[in-house]
Each structure stands twice: as C-alpha cells, then as structure tokens.
Amino acid sequence: MYESVDVVGLTPSPNPFLSMDYYHQNRGCLIPDKGLVSGAARGFRNPHWSGSNHSVETQSTSSEEIVPSPPSPPPPPRVYKPCFVCQDKSSGYHYGVSACEGCKGFFRRSIQKNMVYTCHREKSCIINKVTRNRCQYCRLQKCLEVGMSKESVRNDRNKRKKDDKKQECLENYVLSPDTEKMIEQVRKAHQETFPSLCQLGKYTTNNSADHRVALDVDLWDKFSELSTKCIIKTVEFAKQLPGFTTLTIADQITLLKAACLDILILRICTRYTPDQDTMTFSDGLTLNRTQMHNAGFGPLTDLVFAFANQLLPLEMDDAETGLLSAICLLCGDRQDLEQSDKVDELQEPLLEALKIYVRNRRPHKPHMFPKMLMKITDLRSISAKGAERVITLKMEIPGSMPPLIQEMLENSEGLEGGGSKGAGGGGGGGGGKGAPPGSCSPSLSPSSAHSSPSAHSP
C-alpha cells in the first residue's frame, strides 16, 4: 500500500491511525495494529527512533485493502393509521389527524371557501370510503369530530398567500398557444349559446309591473318557456367545452344537473341594466325587479339582483363569463361522479386560463381573479335557495312543471343529496323522485340536445 515512505522524526505515539501528511507533519508515523510495516521495518535496530531520516519499505497485501461497507438499507415506508374520517388509506397527517388525500382536500376547500352544506336526512349519515361523497354536511362534521383543525387550514392558507405573493412578482403572465386556443373555444361556445345584451332587441310587458304578487300566470308561462330553451342552450355550451364529451354520459348528466342553475343565474345577471333595474332574456324580453318576482323568482329575486350588482365592478367579457361558467360546470366535488379526478383534470387548465387572461386584461388589478372565483360560492348559495324555491313553486303554478325543468332537478344536489349546493333549474323546476343518479335521461343527455324541437336559439 505504501511503497517508499520517508519517516521523519519518528516518535512513539499511542494513536492507532496513520498520519496522512507524511512529509510536513511533525507527528510520528504510527504503526497500525494489523502489521502494515514489512519485515525490513520490523528489523530496524535503533530502538530510540530519533531524528535521522530512514527509508522504510512497506508492502501491500490484499488483506490490507480497505473494503467499503455495504450501503445501509433504505428505511421501511412509513405506515399511517387509516383515514380517521373515511377509513381509506391515509397519505399522512393533515390538519392534525391521519387522513387520505380526498378528505384532506375536501376539508381544506370547505374551510377556505366557507362552504355551507345541508344534510337532507337526519344529520347522522355514515361516512366511509364508499359513502363519503353522498353527504358533504356529515362528512365535514366528521372531519371536525375526529380533530381536523380549521386553524391549521387558515395558517396554511396564509403561508400560501405569502408564497404566492412572492411568486407573483416572478411569474410571466403569457398565454401559450394552447391556452389561447382553449380560451377562444370557450368564448365561441359561450357566444353561440348566449347572445350578448347589445345583440338583442329589447321588448317589455306591462304585466304586473307595479306591485308584487304571489305569481303572475302569464309571466310564468313565458318565463318557463324561456327557461326550457336556456337549459338546452346550456347543454349545447357544455358539449363544446374541451374534454366534456370524453366523460361518461352519467357524469355529463350529473354535472349538468348540478351546475345548470349556477350557469343560468350567472348568464342572466350579465344582462342586468342597473339604471333601469331590469334583466333581459335571450329573446329580448326585459323584466323589472317586480316582474321577475311575479314570474316565479319569488323570494329569490332580491338575491339574484344583488348578485348582478356585485358582478358589475368585475366588468367581465364573454371569455371570462364563458370560462367561469365552464369552471362551475367541470367541478370534481359534485356528488355521485364516477370520475371526479378526471373532472378536476379538465377544470385545472380552465382555472389557469382564466387567471392569466384576467391578469393580462387588468395588469394593475391582481386581485380580480380571486374575486371572480369567489362568485362561484355565491352562485352555489343562490342555487341552493333556488332549488328550495322550486318546491314551493310547484304548488303555486296552475299546471305541471315543464318536463325539462323538472328533469333537470331530479336527484339534484340542492334537493336530494347533502352536497354542496350547486343544483337547480332555470328559475323554476320540479323536485321529486327521478331516475337513479347517473342514469341517462333522454332529454338531458348531451347527445340528444340538438335533436330537441326546442333547441333553436331563443
């Protein structure tokens, strides 16, 4: 190992290791325990080992080579207790308890968005891996019961806000060609199924324009006819969204039933004229607040008009309205979805597109994008009350509910399930029992929208 080592000033030392600096250190060359020094060195006769230079010949042997120790085996994967909420496989400790990714995300969204859920049973639903999406009220209560911390979510959110603010300065809000193409596709889908206010020839009616009544039958007949047409146009809009038709038919119907009223309310509120306090439908019919109440909106009227006023400062164009509608529709937290993960994957690029588009359009208003997203929560709240309004409306109208409006509300989240309140009809619709969740009903099926006799543009 060492062929010709000059030993300078050797002095005895108890140190068991060889000095690595043979030529410059004053410390002696120390002989190791395992006989590294050859016989020539062992025969060195001067027992004092002082001062003079000597040449010590050493020889290496295979037994003297340093063999590296084998690498330590990796530690075994950490095993967590099953999710405290649904007993699914846990991905770690989240917000204070062992939880799966699904329950972690559900709890975070619920707290961050201040979601208000309703249980339409007895507030004692069993929450497990299979049933966790059926009642969001009971699922949230279970999260809190097992110890999930709201404060942890808020702290996490504040940390993310700070990180996002730092990152925002570095981000370059440039639309990629694919994103531009998608925005144009959504804009076109919105414009083809919802003409803007400036394209309409307005007309009015004198029916019950001065005072509120329980229901004006003539206004209701006209309103329900227009609502049916608007539902069909909403289905056509959905069919043109990127990836929507790649979902199962059952999921397409589930999403349409859950979000249709959200989209209808958003659309009609973009046709609000604040100076006259009126709203205009797709055939040009323009109703004031009193007439909207009498046409069937009832106690929902003031909520809808307040929401319309809140939209005014946002000054949304067709692309933004279309993107926000698409985000409402493609929402993976709707109950009874077969492929909720795939729905979330379709929503993600829409969120990114809206973020970049809004920032480019308003470079000096960085908070406009989150303000728009918050409107989805408002829409869901109004939709939930709209679904409740339908129940009373069915008892007020002289005849039966139009079939498409009633079908749209069958098994909707706002009426039957305990889901996030996002279902409803076009200002009127029927509750009642219907087809099983996910069943393919012919008139709501996206594949039959074009064949409907009412599918012409309103």
UniProtKB/Swiss-Prot annotation:
CDD domains: NR_DBD_RAR, NR_LBD_RAR. InterPro entries: NHR-like_dom_sf, NR_DBD_RAR, NR_LBD_RAR, Nucl_hrmn_rcpt_lig-bd, Nuclear_hrmn_rcpt, Retinoic_acid_rcpt, Znf_hrmn_rcpt, Znf_NHR/GATA. Residues 49-64 have a biased composition (Polar residues). In the embryo, zygotic expression largely overlaps that of raraa, with high levels in hindbrain, lateral plate mesoderm (LPM) and tail bud, but in later stages rarab is expressed more broadly in the brain, pectoral fin bud and pharyngeal arches. One of its GO terms (biological process) is cell differentiation. Pfam families: Hormone_recep (PF00104), zf-C4 (PF00105). Transmembrane segments: none annotated. Residues 80-155 bind DNA. Residues 48-75, 411-458 are annotated as: Disordered. Keywords: DNA-binding, Metal-binding, Nucleus, Receptor, Transcription, Transcription regulation, Zinc, Zinc-finger. SUPFAM superfamilies: Glucocorticoid receptor-like (DNA-binding domain), Nuclear receptor ligand-binding domain. A motif (9aaTAD) lies at residues 403-411. Residues 1-79 are annotated as: Modulating. It comes from the Eukaryota. Composed of three domains: a modulating N-terminal domain, a DNA-binding domain and a C-terminal ligand-binding domain. This is Retinoic acid receptor alpha-B. It comes from Danio rerio.
